[in-house]
């Protein structure tokens, strides 16, 4: 089975978490709601990749976020690819900034309460990733 290591990062502000809607331009999981995600490159530290992705996807610099929790790694079967798993490294950062500057990977953003997650069509097992952080 092939595994891809990725980070999935959530920003929290006043008990609201940031969700992003993946755009039509990305390779996988188009138009599904997700956290801030990215592939871990080589022997890169997952927390480093998480901070890079926050800046790339929503324009918030490392100095404006604070790590609250690094969740346990979770393996998620890929519905898109046969014999493939995502090895997900979950992160939760606090952030006072409510303004985001989306890049091409996402088309929309929303700050939601955890109990609102079921109202969104998300990437597979996003709820399970979140339970690693709360």
What are these regions (language model features)?
Residues 29, 36, 96-98, 108:
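Glycine-rich, flexible loop/turn motifs
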Residues 90-94, 101-132:
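NUDIX/MutT-family hydrolases
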Residues 1-18, 39:
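Conserved N-terminal beta-strand and adjoining loop/helix that marks the start
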Residues 4, 13-15, 71-99, 110:
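Active-site-adjacent beta-strand/loop module that shapes the phosphate/pyrophosphate-binding cleft
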């Amino acid at each position: 089975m092939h595994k891809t290591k990725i980070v999935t990062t959530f920003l929290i502000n006043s008990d609201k978490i940031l969700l992003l809607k993946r755009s039509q331009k990305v390779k996988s999981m188009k138009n599904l709601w997700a956290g801030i995600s990215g592939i871990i490159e080589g022997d890169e530290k997952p927390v480093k990749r998480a901070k890079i992705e926050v800046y790339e996807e929503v324009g918030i610099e490392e100095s404006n976020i604070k790590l609250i929790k690094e969740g346990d790694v979770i393996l998620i079967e890929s519905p898109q690819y046969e014999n493939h798993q995502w090895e997900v490294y979950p992160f939760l950062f606090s952030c006072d900034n409510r303004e985001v500057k989306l890049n091409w990977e996402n088309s929309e953003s929303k700050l939601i309460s955890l109990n609102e997650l079921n109202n969104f069509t998300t990437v597979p097992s996003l709820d399970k990733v979140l339970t690693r952080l709360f």
